[in-house]
Amino acid sequence: MKYSKVHTCDFADERDVESGKEFKVCDFEGIQLGIMICYDREYPESARILMLKGAEVILVPNDCGSMQARIRALSTRAYENMVAVAMANPNGDSAGCSCAYSSICWDRNGKCVDNTVLLADDKTEGIFYAEFDMEAIREYRNREMLGNTFRKVEADSQLLSKEIKKPFIRDGQNR
């Protein structure tokens, strides 16, 4: 699969890079994989679109700060879209914290379960492995109520507006 980052950073060296136009999903050995590169993960819609396109696992290559809010957001993307999420990040100050989250957030008895599969610290350099039970994830997606189950698409139309309103207008925005 060839994929270009959709949400480039207008405030950094990426300002002059042409952004991708769509999110893509591919089949890899029977698993539907989607990709969100770095800043793409800042937008919940990125994961939602990948879920709508059939992604079961979303890979997130990342090379920027991994503050706890960003780490928690990936757990939330896994939960709300019923997809597994795995992020790889270099180690070091304001980085590190490669992580993986399962979409499974409660068991068959309705008891909440921790969906953390892997959470590395920000100092250790290495290769980390996260294993997802795809059979369990697929069974979970077939029985639970999140993802696209009860979504009211007509209420989401404002997400398609290109208008940027105060206080979010910035000098030099590439639009």
Model features per residue range: what roles?
Residues H7-T8, D16-G20, E80-V83, R108-D114, ...:
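Short amphipathic alpha-helical surface micro-motifs
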Residues V25, P90-R175:
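C-terminal beta-strand edge segments of enzyme domains
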